[in-house]
UniProtKB/Swiss-Prot annotation:
PANTHER family: A-KINASE ANCHOR PROTEIN AKAP 8 (PTHR12190), DBIRD COMPLEX SUBUNIT ZNF326 (PTHR12190:SF1). Core component of the DBIRD complex, a multiprotein complex that acts at the interface between core mRNP particles and RNA polymerase II (RNAPII) and integrates transcript elongation with the regulation of alternative splicing. Keywords: DNA-binding, Metal-binding, mRNA processing, mRNA splicing, Nucleus, Repeat, Zinc, Zinc-finger. GO terms for biological process: mRNA processing; regulation of DNA-templated transcription elongation; regulation of RNA splicing; RNA splicing. Belongs to the AKAP95 family. A zinc finger (C2H2 AKAP95-type) spans 359-381, 452-475. This is DBIRD complex subunit ZNF326.
Length: 566
């Protein structure tokens, strides 16, 4: 019987649904056996026989064998569509038709013996999906796409023989990378129509083959085990981008910047000679070479002018003048620094800051002459000098000179105090300024305090408070640390004082047996009207002492602020 006659047959559906979710058409037993070829098998068969039949591994014989009753006709479906193979699905649910996934997984329910016309006739029949299935394929079987799970490209568009599954449709040329869906194994059913022949909902380029997730196929997805992608097909992926027109200067896909066309420029070097008028005529021209890439390479000879007559280096005639100017700028910068330091100390400690007697080596400060005199004769001061001599390896003469510098500083401070007029009135004015604006509502009063330099704290001028601070463990630790700090800084102070050029000149006079401080005192007496400028570079040792004192005061302030924060 010609299988094409099935197109003209009147199909009618019985009321009783058949197995596999397919409404089998009514007719004689011989018609069913003849059309579907089940009668030739003779009885129930195992799963392996169906697998071999689906993969074309077993020759199909006795295609039109007749005979057999209803039991023989439906025997194979009973053995195949048992409860275990259906996976617990409702056997009476309509709408699956020939899209049954269990059948599709094993090659489909049609077999491999029928021509394309019979398949098209079954696909064109619209009654098989009358159960209201949402998996309606809008395309006919001849238009379904090929195996999109293999990424085979367009290698099998000319023939339908390679379309092993009825659920595959050739993708259009402008689709997602020639047959590769965006999300082929979507678990949302009809959301992804690309798995059932419909348009793809994804965007962008194909993502290649996605895993089968343990061999569990989603409904409607068919895997073609026959047509695996060949190495040539895999290598051909992405050929669309390679076939795009490339720039003329992109060999092998590597971008090369277009060479910039430049004109050869003759670079002239003029000789730096002031007594040669023909220097412009004798100007040297560098060697210019144009390489193959169009770039200009200039080779300069920087040593050529050095051998010419009248060659003169830059800055030879102005070297001495520049050194003098730099020295002047350095002196002015030092004086400006000293002036700012004096202003800072005056604002911080008051106008009487310069009237204090100090020892730069021991960091001792007092406003009483007796105290400074006793300090200069004390064992603590002598111990500091011995530490300086031990660390610096200075001679005994040098150490005596450093001690005389401190004594001379004390004498000059005493003279400054005597020359200051109205000292008591100025002190009273300062007291008034301190308490200015203070009222009874402010609850403020002036009290005496004792400053501890070791701990950087102010202690009330009370016997109990002072004794309590002396016995505190913080003062014991701070006293030892501060003593070590004084020793370290004393060495730096002595070294900086001796490095001062003015102090060096005084030291030379001191070694000769002269008194260098008397000359400075006489010069200072002539400048009594310029007391504010008395501590300028003429007193080098005092400048260095003030610098060291400022550094120590800054460290003390930092320690005090850190203690208050804690």
């Amino acid at each position: 019987m010609d299988y094409g006659e099935a197109e003209d047959r009147d199909w009618r559906f019985p009321d009783t649904p058949m197995h596999c979710g397919v409404n089998m058409p009514s007719g004689s037993v011989s018609d069913m056996d003849r059309d579907y070829g089940h009668g030739g098998y003779g009885g129930p068969r195992s799963m392996d026989s169906y697998l071999n039949q689906s993969y074309g591994m077993e020759s199909h014989g006795g295609g039109g064998g007749g005979g057999g009753g209803g039991g023989n006709r439906f025997g194979p479906y009973e053995s195949y569509d048992s409860g275990s193979s259906l996976g617990g699905r409702d056997l009476y649910r309509s709408g699956y038709g020939y899209n049954e996934p269990e059948q599709s997984r094993f090659g489909g329910s049609y077999g491999g013996r029928f021509d394309n016309s019979y398949r098209n006739s079954l696909d064109s029949f619209g009654g098989r999906n009358q159960g209201g299935s949402s998996w309606e394929a809008p395309y006919s079987r001849s238009k379904l796409r090929p195996g999109f799970m293999e990424d085979r490209g367009r290698e099998s568009y000319s023939s339908y023989s390679s379309f092993s599954s009825p659920h595959m449709k050739p993708a259009p040329v402008g689709s997602r990378g020639r047959g590769t869906p965006a999300y082929p194994e979507s678990g949302f059913g009809s959301r992804n129509y690309d798995a059932f022949g419909g348009p793809s909902t994804g965007r962008g380029r194909g993502r290649g083959h996605m895993g089968d997730f343990g061999g569990m196929h989603r409904p409607g997805i068919v895997v073609d085990y026959h047509n695996k992608p060949s190495p040539a097909a895999v290598a051909a992926r992405g050929i669309k981008r390679k076939m795009m027109p490339q720039p003329y200067n992109k060999p092998g896909g590597t971008f090369i910047k277009k060479p910039k066309m430049t004109k050869p420029i003759l670079k002239l070097t003029q000789k730096k000679s002031s007594n040669m008028k023909s220097s412009f005529q004798d100007s040297t021209i560098e060697e210019i070479e144009v390489d193959t890439s169009g770039a200009v390479v200039i080779y300069e000879d920087f040593t050529r002018d050095a051998y010419d007559v009248g060659y003169q280096t830059f800055g030879d005639s102005k070297g001495e003048g520049k050194s003098e100017e730099e020295e002047k700028r350095r002196i002015e910068a030092r004086r400006e620094k000293q002036r700012r330091r004096r202003e800072k100390n005056s604002e911080k400690y008051g106008d009487g800051y310069r009237m204090a007697f100090t020892c730069s080596f021991c960091k001792f400060r007092t406003f009483e002459e007796k105290e400074i005199e006793s300090h200069l004769e004390s064992a603590a001061h002598q111990e500091t000098l011995d530490h300086i001599q031990k660390q610096t390896k200075f001679d005994k003469v040098v150490m005596e000179f450093l001690h005389e510098c401190m004594v001379n500083k004390f004498k000059k401070t005493a003279m400054r105090k005597q020359q200051t007029s109205n000292q008591t009135e100025n002190a009273q004015a300062v007291e008034k300024d301190i308490m200015e604006g203070v009222t009874a509502d402010d609850h403020m009063m002036k009290v005496e305090t004792v400053h501890c330099s070791a701990c950087s704290v102010y202690v009330p001028a009370l016997h109990s408070s002072v004794q309590q601070h002396l016995k505190s463990p913080d003062h014991t630790k701070g006293k030892q640390a501060y003593r070590e700090q004084i020793k370290r800084e004393s060495v730096l102070t002595a070294t900086s004082i001796l490095n001062n050029p003015i102090v060096k000149a005084r030291y030379e006079l001191y070694v000769k047996g002269e008194n260098p401080f008397e000359i400075n005192d006489q010069a200072q007496e002539q400048q009594t009207e310029e007391e504010d400028k008395a501590e300028e570079p003429a007193e080098g040792e005092e400048e260095e002492e003030e610098e060291e004192e400022e550094e120590t005061e800054e460290q003390t302030d930092f320690t005090l602020d850190h203690t208050e924060d804690n």
